[in-house]
Amino acid sequence: MWAEKLLARYLEGVPFQIVLEHSRLVANTALDVCERLEMPLNNRVFIEEAALLHDIGVSRVNAPELGLHGDQPYITHGVLGRAILESEGYPLHALVCERHIGVGLTLADILKQNLPLPHRDMYPVSLAEEIICFADLFYSKKPDKLTHKKSVERVRKNLFAFGDEKLRVFEGWVVRFGV
């Protein structure tokens, strides 16, 4: 698929294998949601492509545990991915990159946490963005946990630290998308 080839232009070796495996797991979970929602084929194709590319921005971050030695903080991988995919001519896929962090980031989140990100809302808006964001919550890129799917309860516990609103968003997705 073209999305995997594009990913391979930005990552190589072990980092490529980690991100590809993670992205395939996210894509498969997202496609399961699409099946439950009986989404049309063209929507499913976009969701699969965007899920495969959602972490392309890690190619520019510093995450030695993943074999990544870029010069940017990990939290910026969403906006970096957006820039990459916009430059490649994929503006809708690019938005998925920017909006997939946690359950999404609001301007208030960015300011309150003093995150090194542009000052704007970065939360999923479209159904496709929400589905990919939801699916991504179940998987880690940590090599020793790469193929382990987190339980709904584990995701809840992870999100709890970020506040009730983040948990409410996730709970809404659980009801809407199933698991």
Q: Would you name each region that the model predicts?
A:
Residues 157-179:
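Charged phosphate-binding loop/patch that engages nucleotide di/tri-phosphates or the phosphate backbone
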